[in-house]
């Protein structure tokens, strides 16, 4: 089976083209993704992207993504940029591209040089803040309430409680501003495996959640450290960056256009009246043929 390895800001994916036919059986996709993403034993990646025909005529193409633990995600910002580049360069010269995702419609606009996609601007939709959209269950809050810089108790020895905000941008995110928690990003990096994992699996989040630690540098710049649901630490997260900027702006910490610095590089996020836009690139690394999935 042929596949393509791609990355966006160091977030790496195995891309499988199923536009003209299924290559991995539906019931096997989760286990296949878990095995092939295992670094050192198989190809290794943060996730697997499947390109498929859309389920209705309102879309051009369908995006599906499975995390390295085999769980299927609703959306992925870095993944959809890789996806959009692949689709334009190898399947259809459609620009803008209307993409069907589990999180709803996403529209990719591409900056083209020759036949190559250099930059992708993705319409990320309108954020949802109600607890029922996360979902989140916490005492004292109703399902239509928002959770903005609210406090959760933790059980780890490093951070007994945390102030965080939640938002859904196609998938759910918890955004933690380090300055509001009297910690810094060095502390976060030292204890990320413990704190990030606990928040991801916290009982308040029955479907788990992505976790982002944010330092506001100035009204136009932030720095982010990410713990992704189903993947753990990653060098970048497009939807998480979008969520972080949305929350920073909503809480009055930044302007509506922000440059976000991540371990894998930079992303630009712009908040407009009709929704949120993410701007960044993607890289096609190599094509290969899978001989053995590994174990």
UniProtKB/Swiss-Prot annotation:
Coiled-coil ranges from the UniProt annotation: none
Per the UniProt record, which EC number(s) apply here? 5.1.1.7
Annotated substrate binding lies at 11, 67, 77-78, 171, 210, 228-229, 238-239
Question: Between which residues do disulfide bridges form?
Answer: none
Compartments reported by the entry: Cytoplasm
What does the record give as the active site?
76, 237
SUPFAM superfamilies named among the record's database cross-references: Diaminopimelate epimerase-like
Pathway noted in the entry? Amino-acid biosynthesis; L-lysine biosynthesis via DAP pathway; DL-2,6-diaminopimelate from LL-2,6-diaminopimelate: step 1/1
Name of this protein: Diaminopimelate epimerase
Q: Tell me what organism the protein belongs to.
A: Methanocaldococcus jannaschii (strain ATCC 43067 / DSM 2661 / JAL-1 / JCM 10045 / NBRC 100440)
